Amino acid sequence: MKFHFLSSNNPEAKNTEKKLTELFGQNSVKDADYIIPIGGDGLLLKSLHNFNKLNKPFFGINFGSIGFLMNNLSNENLNDMITNAKKSTFKPLKMTAQSVNNEIFEAYAYNEVSLMRQTHLASKIKIKINEKVKMEELICDGVLLSTSAGSTAYNLSAHGSILPLDSKILALTPISAFRPRRWRGALLSEISKIDFEVLNNDERSSSVTADNVEFRDISKVNIVSSDENKCTVLFDSKHSIEDKILNEQFNF
């Protein structure tokens, strides 16, 4: 097996990268069989964006504050951990946004796409699902659409539903909804087409973010699940990601 190791700025992560490089050698990202990010979920997310075109599996090693999608490095041989690992396919969301000046932006998100107010005024957003209006006006700080992989990130902080990793469901979640106040969001099929329209965008300007890429002064957003830029992420078979997701739903 050939590995490409990369780490966050965490001193422990850097030290682990050094030790693993001494044990297994360091290969270029193009020559490696596996890409091994050492850090937190943020580093894994960054790696997926940077290297998705290479069609290499990712095996994250946890040295982050949360590391929900990462694996704990045990005394077991790394080769054995990867050989026995469970595979999961991460399909990104493809976001197409239009600015108030009619500029068009595209970006991909493995976690979520969020549309947020960028002034002191609440956003007013019309929501369409599969080209049918489902909400004429959501008054809120914002709204987000999350993948199953991203459902334990920003979506969870916004009180959205946690989704099983293989569920093929998207979570649509309001952020600090004012009207309708009791609306908690919706669970949508992965094949759904979602459209947001910012109402009164001349005075209630909004920005849209796809993972870590932001565009400002947005008037419309279209989101679909995409087969482009899919990634394979590996999980330690002895520490099930499914159990992590289940347990997270009972943490208070």
Q: What residue ranges belong to the model's regions?
A:
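ATP/NTP phosphate-donor binding region
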Residues: 1-34, 38, 44-53, 73-89, ...
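Short glycine-/acidic-enriched loop or helix-start segments at secondary-structure transitions
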Residues: 15, 46-48, 69-71, 155-157, ...
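Gly/Ser/Thr-rich active-site loops/lids in small-molecule metabolic enzymes
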Residues: 144-181
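ATP/nucleoside-binding phosphotransfer catalytic cores, i.e., glycine-rich phosphate-binding loops
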Residues: 107, 115, 120, 133-135, ...
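Short glycine-rich anion-binding loops that position phosphate/pyrophosphate groups of nucleotides
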Residues: 40-43, 64-66, 149-152
